[in-house]
Amino acid sequence: MISIEGLSKVFSLNKKDIKAVDSLTLNIENGDIYGVIGYSGAGKSTFVRLINRLEEPTSGKVTIGDQVITELNKNDLRVARQDIGMIFQHFNLLWSRTVEDNIGFPLEIAGVDKQEKARRVKELIGLVGLEGREKSYPSQLSGGQKQRVGIARALANSPKVLLCDEATSALDPETTNQILSLLQDINEKLNLTIILITHEMHVIRKICNRVAVMEQGKVVEEGQVLDVFTNPKQLVTRKFVEQVMSSNEDSDISTIIENYPDGVLYRVHFLGETTNQTLISQIAKQFSVDLNIIQGNITQTQAGSYGALVVQVTGNESEIERAKSFIESQESVELEVIQHAK
């Protein structure tokens, strides 16, 4: 487990103290893909650099396993960093070295013999899907391929933790999804703990199981990704959730009521395991009502789906009431009546 207690970083600028990270406390379990999200200036990149002491903390404590990272001397820290891999937004590759030489560089520094280094590099090239690119230079690679080299290099010493600082921010959407899928695959194969820094909620949604939301150097909200999606408490969190939900339902409701005056209007919220397709199909088969899906958005997280549909239900009043009771009886579904039958 990674334990972070009261971690702070203060920078002095023009004789003023600026708290980039302010008394941050988190616990991250082994094997987690843990997302940290925030807008520019929230302190998230400073925070991740405090974990491996690329930035020295002003105060606080970082413990990884049974090692207190913040108390290590320089020599012990150098050894401990072999268990902490890191990838960056702009790849940080050595441009005069080939793919295989970039990946093997940490092994070279660690004094690994040539035969073992060659074996490990070949293994990593296969893991990240770069077969055939061994002799290529960074200038000959796409952005996604460069990041794959960065990931392989970060894994060279078989770390227990991988820090990802905006690792997909410089990539197009399709390549971003490919890199996220690769990270998820590596997490599952190696039981690697991943801490992922981002300003994009769809990155959190796609692969993270827990998330911390940072604002002005502090964690303002933290929890399971699905819980944060379904019940965001802070304004900054709601803004991030809107990135992936793209919902303007509230502003449209008056128009919907005006355009669909018949029957009943429900907003049905789906949480976790229940799928909208299954529920709507069951209602159509079991009850003598007509269903009209007017508006909706469903998104997937690692823990299940989340979203809402606005549905018009018309038919016999007793059948509408039976359908309503059926919806309310379902687990992981919440029903909100927007407009009663006239």
UniProtKB/Swiss-Prot annotation:
Enzyme class: translocase
Membrane-protein topology: Peripheral membrane protein
Disulfide bonds: none
Keyword terms, alphabetized: Amino-acid transport, ATP-binding, Cell membrane, Membrane, Nucleotide-binding, Translocase, Transport
Location, primary (coarse class): membrane
Record GO terms (molecular function): ABC-type D-methionine transporter activity; ATP binding; ATP hydrolysis activity
UniProt key word Translocase: yes
Subcellular location: Cell membrane
Annotated ranges, domain ABC transporter: 2-241
EC number(s) reported in the record: 7.4.2.11
A UniProt-annotated Pfam family: ABC_tran
Keyword Kinase: no
Coiled coil: none
Binding site for ATP: G38, Y39, S40, G41, A42, G43, K44, S45
Catalytic activities: L-methionine(out) + ATP + H2O = L-methionine(in) + ADP + phosphate + H(+); D-methionine(out) + ATP + H2O = D-methionine(in) + ADP + phosphate + H(+)
Complexes and interactors: The complex is composed of two ATP-binding proteins (MetN), two transmembrane proteins (MetI) and a solute-binding protein (MetQ).
Protein family (similarity comment): Belongs to the ABC transporter superfamily. Methionine importer (TC 3.A.1.24) family.
Function in brief: Part of the ABC transporter complex MetNIQ involved in methionine import. Responsible for energy coupling to the transport system.
Protein's name in the database: Methionine import ATP-binding protein MetN 2
Gene: metN2
